[in-house]
Amino acid sequence: MDFRKGEIIAIDKPYRMSSFGALAHVRYLLSKKLGFKVKIGHAGTLDPLATGVLVLCTGKCTKQIEQLQTHTKEYTATLQLGATTASYDKEHSVNHTYPTKHITRQLVEETPVSYTHLRAPR
């Protein structure tokens, strides 16, 4: 691999790490191993609470970032019905639980998703 000429690499961004933090860590590791500062950028951010593929471009491939950002993305989520947390995400422990016996797969699939461009699973 020639990181100076340019490479496109995909990493699995860890939970609680920012996209910039992940990029900085990879830059540090590559620069230390190669003996020179590696030019590196990412083709889109992920929330620190999200995990998933983060596309990194090095060297001359950083010029392709804008084009890579036009590609379709797919998101998946796991949720727990009948539970809340202080922050409404998994950053805090469950603080209240509610009955869920009335929630059926059909009800979930027929309930409109409130976020733009998202759809219920099939």
Predicted regions and their residues:
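Catalytic/RNA-binding core of pseudouridine synthases
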Residues: 1-122
